[in-house]
């Protein structure tokens, strides 16, 4: 069991007054941030040698940790905006778990254009694209905060609209197994490593873009012949339709490892 605190990490300085054409958003970088790691590690090793000269060994280790930002100059409470639709900010905030994934509740696809029309009467989805572009096979975003529209609000801790923490990309468990054997001066060894309980947001160009779509899993997309498809309908990657369906973190396309 351990705790490690890393101080004087690089973070933004105080905002520069808006004088002489310098924007308050243009902040210098200084050593003023702090990160705290807490975790544990378990390791077991067995080594033996037989009378015939054959030796062997096996080892196993597993560890878990959580890294939390305890000091960071972000008085506005701006959120990390990877694939959320928020502009600009790529910072952290105090209390943030490293690796956290913010996204939208969206578990289903629209099954019919009638469903699209009925839903758009109740929920405004114009943050993603105009109402006339929505069709069956598009991602169905949920109005999580109940205000009649889906958007990220002001993108802050105090007002993040329908954005919420949907997962974390940091592995909860990391483990390894090592094997070794030896006989008369010859030795062989093997090492296996892995992680468990980790999320991955399948948004942006990482998996669903252009020439990257060459796995058989990409064939499981929504169509009239495949209404139960996992992926949304096929669209041009240069359009708002693509961005709305594949450009945002959603619960539907949050993968678990």
Label each region the model flagged.
Residues 1-257:
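Outer/extracellular conduits and scaffolds centered on Gram-negative outer-membrane beta-barrels
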